[in-house]
């Protein structure tokens, strides 16, 4: 019969050791809660950390960029600028379109921001042009966020106008109603319309003007209330034939009489069914199409939104004619799922490797089963907490769990190893479990809370980076806490039931061989440690050297922000000369498409020409290149981009700018390349002076590539210089001149055709086929006060000038954005420093301000806070350790292990050619928590030996190092193997995971080798310092 130890032994573990059924059921409950939580958790690429962003679009066909800025954008900006919680406001005013992007503070709910935007639009309504065809429309979407899904709609039998009409009414509206969808954009949208193309010569010959025609059309097509008749016995609603629905009806419209004979619209104009805007076009591969881009709302889950769309698509396509084909060209969730699947596989690999290393050290199947149960239980239990915290299964939380594999097994290893040591000494399993668990309990608590202390500063990181890593830090902390609970409850209980002297002594050939190997390693370590303790100052100099080396490596290592991911989608901008027309740009775009589609890595291509919410001018085109899956192509995205740019360089007259889409989008506007730098001034004249000078210098920097600017001030303008005196004598106002020009050349929307399903426009313009270019202005006629017809040329001169193709604002002031990429042999930190140095050489005036934007600005912010973040982690851990050990000295001994980890991590990153980015920095912070475990295990046992066995400090630390050598080696290798799958990852999203693994593996290897020798030396030096300090105080007291 087994004699139980006294009830004072076992500590907090005693209750669970003595009640195995209750402990087992408790663990089953944790397991079930975790499984249920896993099934309930949403899946995403990264934590949802989007800024609340709203885009406001206003269309005013025919308006110049200058008119759009002053008449539409500026009044709206003044109202938006008064909203609380607004972080940044940017706008782009181009020909016929104003796009304002409003980015709010992270703390402001999107719904609240939406209400403020609507109120601001309402307040600005009276300030906007009275002939604005439609009021401003807002969407809860970030325009820089790539579409979650792109669909192409084509037809072999129907014109694009009919296809667009069906897609808009039957498909796009339904998709827009799906939860999480922020905006559905129809690129190349050929909306049906009745186009009236006036024959200038015909109306002039009849003494008519375009304004006469416009007035006749608007008066003939109305749709207003008419009332009803309410008699004694019945009510009658009034109706009339006041609507004209077809081109034929408009063709027969009488617009005037001459000599008693009617003049019909068809006599002076070509009237046809056409497109509302003839300067829009989109293509899927080489076929003209309606391209439907679906963007999510900020904060919406991509996976669930895309799944809802795919579930609805079959039902929607069934309502379309058979000649209409809907093709899904890209779906970002495909790569997101693949990335998450790869990370989950790496998590399983980490668990398998950790269990393998445990068996290698323990050489005992029962002893291996215990942590083999504890590790998955700790990780699975974390899912239950993640549900309550509203987290998701994403790359960062899965990376946290993968790293946690090496952490959580440490607690189990420490407990098992200590209990096994007592069983091998002859203790009964139950007594050994109670004694071993009680002895190691404080160490487990110290390890747990000191490691969590390292993660605390991550929770206080500001802005979007802090939000991004909050889920990572909390997930890891929860896994560590659950591991500590499991290690103090389930693990000792299983040890008491599964371990025995017979099982621990049972050895096979492998066990005996490995035991001899470990004995030789420990003996060699003991001899080496004895020599090191005899030369403390030499060892201390090595420790100080690692500190100095870590600082030097930190200064010189290339620095970045976020790893560039290969998500299989490339966004592109095609740029042509500023005077390019729509037809010219469409032709150039098709030439480029032919080149791109020949690349073996390209699966499909969508392209768009025209002015809309993301494309500012007719001389640019927008591209989306969808690559084949990663396992079906030989090269990663950066090599594909380089190859495509080289191929397109052979196409004359165009510049192509490409960038891979990323899961993390911080920018608020679609840019040509990955990084942005802005110049802001109080006037456009100041920008026109300084932008070319800065561009010239930046294009010469080797640290930058693909440098471009959105400053386009060479757009051709035909300036109509009216002689106001002559016009006034004839009774012609400037409003008459503007109306005549707008009627002729503005694709003016003059009337609306109402149907049961949609509304369509009547478009008025001059037929300029026979009078191209500036000659068309000679055909303009105006009506004088006496009813005569006056040629525009008689009161005005035409001057050719240059003007901006688009006018951009940032927080209401003119701005230009310079975009750039970083070559492979340089880092983002190099590029940022080069730009800052170049800016200083220009001596910019005080009214010019510069600032990095988007991810570059976030990089600067993260880089500035990194050192403080690490310092905060060290201070937090010092405070926790000081509280736990009730000592000012021992925490310093433990923290002395940190420089070795930093040296190892930085060296590994440099050897691997990886930048010190945000992911790598998180790895270094985690190393701070890992490597101090070695010192904690040594110091705990040394202090116990001094206190309980009366050993000298040197004997105590020497014995502690030898006794704890095996668990130290086991825990370090477990942590290393937990990070190894991340370091070796090659699948989708590997770019995101690899820096974390590289830094941790490098840091663990170097720290493992050095801290086994430096920690005991520093422990003894601080012990001598403490004795010297005490003796000095004692001497002063005696003298007093």
UniProtKB/Swiss-Prot annotation:
Part of a tripartite efflux system composed of MdtA, MdtB and MdtC. MdtB forms a heteromultimer with MdtC. It is a multi-pass membrane protein. The chain crosses the membrane at residues 16-36, 347-367, 369-389, 396-416, 440-460, 472-492, 537-557, 863-883, 888-908, 911-931, 968-988, 998-1018. The MdtABC tripartite complex confers resistance against novobiocin and deoxycholate. The gene is mdtB. InterPro entries: AcrB_DN_DC_subdom, Acrflvin-R, Multidrug-R_MdtB. Pfam families: ACR_tran. GO terms for molecular function: xenobiotic transmembrane transporter activity. This is Multidrug resistance protein MdtB. GO terms for cellular component: plasma membrane. SUPFAM superfamilies: Multidrug efflux transporter AcrB pore domain, PN1, PN2, PC1 and PC2 subdomains (SSF82693), Multidrug efflux transporter AcrB TolC docking domain, DN and DC subdomains (SSF82714), Multidrug efflux transporter AcrB transmembrane domain (SSF82866). Belongs to the resistance-nodulation-cell division (RND) (TC 2.A.6) family. MdtB subfamily. It comes from Escherichia coli O1:K1 / APEC. Keywords: Cell inner membrane, Cell membrane, Membrane, Transmembrane, Transmembrane helix, Transport. The keyword Nucleotidyltransferase does not apply. Induction: The mdtABC operon is transcriptionally activated by BaeR. It is found in: Cell inner membrane.
